[in-house]
Amino acid sequence: MTMRRLVLVLVPAVLLCAYAVRAEKEDLKSGPQAGDNLPGPLLSIVAYSDEPSLVGKKLDLTERYGQDPVILVFAREMTKPLTDLVRKLDAEVAKRKSAKLRAIVVILSDDDALEQNLKDFAAKDGIKNFNLAFMEPAGPKHYKLSKEADVTVLLYKRQKVEANHAFKKGELNEKGVEKIVADVPKIASKR
């Protein structure tokens, strides 16, 4: 085979592989998608809350906040990008108190030190407008969270998902955080 024919065969093959990898990354689905209703209760143990009376209790915060707009984050661990996301969303919630915007992070882990670590994080970073909770690593089965997703973010209002963002391990970055923050107006409008 001549070099020219080899190039004509290899270049399209490489481009096809690159497209397939990109499509696979974009197709990560985790949890209910935009347009879906929340699938039901979400019982988790509250480690930190803007409502101190909730701390230490096993609650369904999705039921508690009813029809209010909520940013619900499921994560497998507290990473630097996740803490950056929490800080930015904490500021968004503070700006949108009149819309009754709420935010919940549920860490999916059975780490014995997690509850204290979440309390320490909230105190150290001055988190004021958030609920930090945890539950078993598998997460709520009826939410159908992907095992491939390290972070799943649902933005919903009136129990209906308006936006969904899912990230594999190491994929949540500043650009992803900005996309999530840009979707907050979808749920935090006054109507």
Feature locations, PLM:
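Short, internal strand/loop/helix patches
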Residues: 121-146
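Bacterial N-terminal signal peptides that target proteins for export
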Residues: 1-10
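Thiol/disulfide oxidoreductase modules built on the thioredoxin-like
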Residues: 137-177
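Short active-site neighborhood of thiol/selenol oxidoreductases, capturing the structured segment around
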Residues: 59-84, 101-104
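Bacterial N-terminal signal peptides
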Residues: 9-18
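A short beta-strand-turn-helix
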Residues: 43-71, 91
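Typically the conserved alpha-helix immediately C-terminal to a functionally engaged Cys/Sec
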Residues: 77-94, 115-116, 121
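N-proximal helix/coil linker or "cap" segments that precede and/or mark the start of modular domains
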Residues: 20-48
